[in-house]
A protein has these predicted regions:
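Donor/substrate-binding cores of folate-linked one-carbon enzymes
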Residues: 2-92
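Short, basic/aromatic-enriched C-terminal tail that caps enzymatic domains
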Residues: 86-106
């Protein structure tokens, strides 16, 4: 999802981050649940948000983060280093994401 969840579920996340003059923006990779963008977060990638950038520049930077992080998370899922138990993300001892916490920016 193209935001640092739980911030900005739904659509138009890049514009919302820019309109609110957020200091950071990014992506969240999460399990899908019935709640809109409310599933447990597996990993997040963040960038400093330059408010002088155009929307297209922000989207391009977000795509670069996505293209880096998605395959790494998929590999961990396929290698069963990440799983879901009782609606909580579980990491194996050798997962690169095991010590990561959801990012929080004000």
């Amino acid at each position: 999802h193209p935001s640092l969840l739980p911030k900005y579920p739904g659509l138009n996340t890049h514009q919302q981050a820019m309109d609110n003059q957020d200091s950071h923006h990014g992506i969240s990779i999460h399990y899908v649940t019935e709640e809109l963008d409310g599933g447990p977060i597996i990993a997040q990638g963040a960038m400093k948000l330059d408010l002088q950038s155009s929307l297209e520049e922000v989207i391009d930077k977000i795509h670069r983060i996505e293209h880096d992080l998605y395959p790494r998370v998929v590999a961990e899922l396929l290698d069963m280093k990440v799983g879901l138990k009782d609606n909580t993300v579980q990491f194996s001892h050798d997962s690169e994401f095991k010590d990561a916490q959801p990012l929080q920016f004000n």
